[in-house]
Amino acid sequence: MERTNTTTFKFFSLGGSNEVGRSCHILQYKGKTVMLDAGIHPAYQGLASLPFYDEFDLSKVDILLISHFHLDHAASLPYVMQRTNFQGRVFMTHPTKAIYRWLLRDFVRVTSIGSSSSSMGTKDEGLFSDEDLVDSFDKIETVDYHSTVDVNGIKFTAFHAGHVLGAAMFQIEIAGLRVLFTGDYSREVDRHLNSAEVPPLSSNVLIVESTFGTATHEPRLNRERKLTQLIHSTVMRGGRVLLPVFALGRAQEIMLILDEYWSQHADELGGGQVPIFYASNLAKKCMSVFQTYVNMMNDDIRKKFRDSQTNPFIFKNISYLRNLEDFQDFGPSVMLASPGMLQSGLSRDLLERWCPEDKNLVLITGYSIEGTMAKFIMLEPDTIPSINNPEITIPRRCQVEEISFAAHVDFQENLEFIEKISAPNIILVHGEANPMGRLKSALLSNFASLKGTDNEVHVFNPRNCVEVDLEFQGVKVAKAVGNIVNEIYKEENVEIKEEIAAKIEPIKEENEDNLDSQAEKGLVDEEEHKDIVVSGILVSDDKNFELDFLSLSDLREHHPDLSTTILRERQSVRVNCKKELIYWHILQMFGEAEVLQDDDRVTNQEPKVKEESKDNLTNTGKLILQIMGDIKLTIVNTLAVVEWTQDLMNDTVADSIIAILMNVDSAPASVKLSSHSCDDHDHNNVQSNAQGKIDEVERVKQISRLFKEQFGDCFTLFLNKDEYASNKEETITGVVTIGKSTAKIDFNNMKILECNSNPLKGRVESLLNIGGNLVTPLC
């Protein structure tokens, strides 16, 4: 496979696509790789039963998630962990791990995979050994339901799947993309398990089982009634009943049904008249696991456990049978035997023993995989091959029936679940080709109305080793950390206060006495808050797919691995005027400037330098100013140098300073000032002469420029036709009109004559104070 594209999600199945068995799927996105399940195919032996591991480099896998303990989902895990170049981490739920060890140990011992001879007569060494199983077991990590685990940017959460004890569906999130893998799941509440959950968060991709395609199950109570009636009628005629089951899972469900039925019909069946046996090498060990995890089952089981103070899985009418040597086969009996596919073990031995008699019954209660004896016998063949010598055939005269208690969803349950998930992309797995194809057609037909819209649903049913590529454009969300969080809260509070003031003021004027806090709250809630603008640094963690928004001062604390470099800009400009004139223009533009060095006493201010450096200063004719906090202006002779740290605000201020320097010698104000102040005198005389030439109207015009910048066309200044005529008795006014809010200003006395809005009044007063400070040296 090619390297994962940064925006492409890749699905690649190594097994379990267009087949049931050896489930194993690969997910790749943003350089992360997730492996789902590692099973074997019950119909095959040896290496042929494995997923196609050679088709993918397993060293790329970051994590492997096991959905449940069934062999077709977990049996090749020791092989992956011990016999391949796999280096990732493995996760499963607590009950799954508890059962996994015993189930796999029995798998190695019983099946032909662990100890068979090839047709050439050479010993098959097996896929893995008991030592491999023990070593792999210690490396497996467990997860709790509903807890989210983060592994280097891959987040996953386990939810109840309802298939067997410990079965989980996993919702995986990588860089904002969410994928839900159902594994085998059931939406039916049975006698001991809850139904599968619907995760609260939506998913972009749904990988869902399609075991039964478009088939529909009978109601559970009907199936239970059929099961008990068939078994009852068989044993009443002296027959024996064989139920091939997996050692764990549906076996416990059927035992709960039979134990209750035997208790209800104790006169005919109880008291040892018709014994029920649970034949498995792991019988007692398996049941101890179920007895341990009662509290992870449904309410009915937990209630029985609380009320009776006895474990529901301690059966009154069922006995455990470890091997057939202890079985006295003298009359009617019911036998639940593993494995469920009848490929080997106790169930196969009993099948060959009982199938020649027509009074006996083989009752298939689970899903039968193609290529297995369970699937073959459902065809009711006349003979079956012997497991010890396939050339010898055994007549089949027994009755064969199927009543499915497989904990898989039918079509209606699957469709309802898919609609609740509402994923735009659906990938079908774990189903034979024909049922899966029918399910795909049914889903496309169901979602046909969405075709061509933004909500169109895409359905895929890829074969093994066929890649599915999906393009996604994720939404990135940054997390604010550090001091910038306080800055955001501060800005929010300011916005809220301004909105309250702006909304409440008109109501106060209309009916000041009737204003209450409830009306105030309603006014604020009517309108959404404005966007808040804050400045900071966006740090991307590509490994964990996280974005942090923080201030520069917090960078070292939250990201110590990052180093910072501060870039300072420097621009030099030739000037052909005195420093006094430049200083005057700087004050006009910015109101104030901090004096760092003033050798020629241009500013009449004491330079702000450190005490220890005062003695080292020599008179070089420098004028150094600090403007707006970070911009440094140095003037020596005819050269002016501007230095600043790059950011949006500093760049804007620096541009303004450079514009002043480039035009200072030709500006009208400069010409007017210099025409009276270029003769030889000190700075005090320059100021006094300039002040004497600027009259009241000029002062107002300077201040009005601030209002024009702030309010634009909303501000109007009223002057005489002869604006330089000295008429001290006439008041010079200005008016600011914003919507229904109006402020009338007396510029002679620098005060507000009238204003009907407190927020507007505050803004105008601030501008009057700033304007007064700016022109004071000139008045």
Swiss-Prot record:
UniProt keyword list: Endonuclease, Hydrolase, Metal-binding, mRNA processing, Nuclease, Nucleus, Phosphoprotein, Zinc
Active site: H408
PTM-bearing positions, type Phosphoserine: S517
Binding site for Zn(2+) 1: H68, H70, H163, D184
Alphabetical list of InterPro entries matching this protein: Beta_Casp, CPSF73-100_C, MBL, Metallo-B-lactamas, RibonucZ/Hydroxyglut_hydro, RMMBL
GO CC annotation terms, alphabetical: mRNA cleavage and polyadenylation specificity factor complex; nucleus
Protein name from the UniProt record: Endoribonuclease YSH1
Organism (species): Saccharomyces cerevisiae (strain ATCC 204508 / S288c)
Encoding gene (name): YSH1
